[in-house]
Amino acid sequence: MLEHLRATDPIIADLIEREAQRQRQGLELIASENYTSLAVMEAQGSVLTNKYAEGLPGRRYYGGCEFVDAIEQLAIERACQLFGTSHANVQPHSGAQANIAVFTALLQPGDTILGMRLDHGGHLTHGSPVNFSGKWYNVHFYGVDAQTGQIDYDDLASKARAIRPKLITSGVSAYPRIIDFARMRQIADEVGALLMADIAHIAGLVAAGEHPSPVGHAHVITTTTHKTLRGPRGGLILMGDDFAKQLNSSVFPGTQGGPLMHVIAGKAVAFGEALRPEFRQYAAQIRRNARALAEGLMAQGLTLVSGGTDNHLMLVDLRSTGLTGAQAQRALDKAAITVNKNAIPDDPQPPMKTSGIRIGTPAVTTRGMREPEMAQIAAWIGEVLMYPDDEARLNRIAGEVADLCRHFPVPADMVQVRG
């Protein structure tokens, strides 16, 4: 499939092939990563990348949009069907762009927002001082209970009463437990706040009924379209009639220009795939695998924040091992096991070191792995973290990982990337 690229730019072609090899021979345990289908990749690699289409279907600023109109309309309809909403905007280039559009539509600079602390599992776009959200708005934070590691809803409610925020965000990037959207809406209503649910990590679980839905609770919902949803990298906004017009205008012309029609086509394909019964089976297996992996890690003597997981990810507290998250990530990389360093609640380490690692099961579940493989993966992780500097041991494990991966190849579409 790369014959034209090899002829034009062999350096890039070689790097792509090497990345494909890395994905085939290693275990991808980064909670935000997954493998798309060949159908999604074909849509993204199509002639749609050539087409400008500013505006919405039927209301474009360019001619020649009859076919991209049909594609975007399908993406909108499938997204609404998948999540049970009346309106969707499929144009955001990313989850961050979706959040920017929501904030600029619903807030004025200086308005007060209440978001989850980044080191407690929140996200940069929910008020971090290094992000636009922390620079433009008056931000206050809630977090998790120190004993349980779960969201402290009583403290959240107390803070909301004290500061009377314009917007409360319920969204996470490293939180392993179920989010109580109904309780969040109750708190928001009590103080007259709007509720935004950022379900970027759990969208696939929500769509499949494996996590409670924010629909009917949140005033607006944002998400990415990859991660557990297994689509192309991009963003999505879901909403009802009350905010549809202003949110659509906030995406275009408010914060973006021309939409990426090839990515929107990929989103439409992915939404269609997620509407099939087998996607529900896939999402259920993600959670079963996560529970099995969490149990295996705890059996290795490792500590998990909150003591386990209800969704697709878990957060390992490494302080008892003497390793930082960065050190653990490097050692696991050498063993062909990919994770990411991640802050734990009230982490004493700086962001580039951290005291934890985040682990997720969406990608290995796509490969067809199940609970027995999770037990083996947990054993490998435990061994690596016990002997992080034993190069011979790490090389042996990398070989064993490659052997396992041969029995559970990445989707056939990925293999075809080799040509």
UniProtKB/Swiss-Prot annotation:
The keyword tRNA processing does not apply. One of its GO terms (cellular component) is cytosol. (6S)-5,6,7,8-tetrahydrofolate binds at L118, G122, H123, L124. GO terms for molecular function: glycine hydroxymethyltransferase activity; pyridoxal phosphate binding. Its cofactor is pyridoxal 5'-phosphate. It catalyses: (6R)-5,10-methylene-5,6,7,8-tetrahydrofolate + glycine + H2O = (6S)-5,6,7,8-tetrahydrofolate + L-serine. Its EC number is 2.1.2.1. PROSITE patterns: SHMT. It is an enzyme of class 2 (transferase). Catalyzes the reversible interconversion of serine and glycine with tetrahydrofolate (THF) serving as the one-carbon carrier. This reaction serves as the major source of one-carbon groups required for the biosynthesis of purines, thymidylate, methionine, and other important biomolecules. Also exhibits THF-independent aldolase activity toward beta-hydroxyamino acids, producing glycine and aldehydes, via a retro-aldol mechanism. This is Serine hydroxymethyltransferase. The lineage of its organism: Bacteria, Bacillati, Chloroflexota, Chloroflexia, Chloroflexales. The gene is glyA.
